[in-house]
Regions:
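Helix-start (N-cap) detector for alpha-helical repeat units in TPR-like alpha-solenoids
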Residues: 1-2, 34-36, 69-70, 85, ...
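Canonical tetratricopeptide repeat
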Residues: 6, 40, 74, 108, ...
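Residue-level recognition of tetratricopeptide repeat
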Residues: 9, 43, 77, 111, ...
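Structural signature of tandem alpha-helical TPR/SEL1-like repeats
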Residues: 13-26, 47-60, 81-94, 115-128, ...
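Structural marker of alpha-solenoid helical repeat scaffolds
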Residues: 30, 64, 98, 131-133, ...
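Ligand/cofactor pocket segment of small-molecule handling proteins
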Residues: 66-116
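Terminal, low-structured helical/coil segments at or just beyond the last alpha-helical repeat
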Residues: 162-202
Length: 202
């Protein structure tokens, strides 16, 4: 039922995955044709780093609704977390054909392209992500791209400062990792924060 799904979503937010799984398993026994149930189950396993199980469940969700942005975004994130960058980009681009204003897809294409060494493309992706929203993640991503292209670029510092003032948790490398920042961009971001130590005080 709808109330069960709402409760399981609340439990996922609280990171009470075991309780959420129990509700979802009961829901699946009663209704095997609701893509939302498979999606929520896939989300739990994704957060638990069980990517194989998450992928199997998201495939079931896609059979029932192949154009749902939430379902597609989770599939893209599974690919990104597995370092399947080209596959992730392909899924995110499918989302953008449905809704070009969905900034998280632009942002995550930027993350994938950075890992592929396509820095100029990554810059375009982060700029596109910022067209409709001043989200901290894409601002910091853009700052790191500019820093990569020119370590003495003052604009990169100013953009990063704005991002950190908006969301200080992006200073934390573990938090960035949870947001699917890959090895290459994490490495450069660490160099950036070492060079600009004053940003750690915000």
């Amino acid at each position: 039922s709808l109330s069960s799904l709402i409760l399981s979503e609340a439990l996922i937010l609280k990171k009470d995955f075991q309780a959420a799984k129990k509700i979802i398993n009961i829901s699946l026994r009663h209704n095997k044709n609701d893509p939302k149930i498979y999606y929520l189950a896939a989300k739990i396993y994704f957060l638990e780093d069980n990517l194989k199980k998450s992928k199997n469940l998201i495939d079931e969700a896609l059979k029932l609704n192949e154009d749902n942005i939430d379902i597609l975004f989770l599939l893209g994130n599974i690919n990104l977390k597995k370092n399947l960058f080209a596959e992730a980009i392909e899924v995110y681009e499918k989302i953008l054909k449905i809704n070009n204003g969905f900034w998280p897809a632009h942002n995550n294409i930027g993350l994938a392209n950075f890992e592929l060494g396509k820095i100029e493309l990554s810059k375009t992706n982060f700029i596109n992500a910022l067209k409709n929203t001043n989200n901290a993640e894409s601002m910091l991503g853009l700052a790191i791209v500019l820093f990569t292209q020119n370590p003495d670029n003052e604009e990169s510092f100013n953009i990063a400062k704005k991002a950190i003032l908006s969301s200080p948790k992006f200073i934390n490398s573990e938090f960035r990792k949870s947001e699917l920042w890959g090895v290459e961009i994490q490495k450069i971001t660490s160099q950036f924060f070492k060079k600009n130590k004053e940003l750690n005080d915000y």
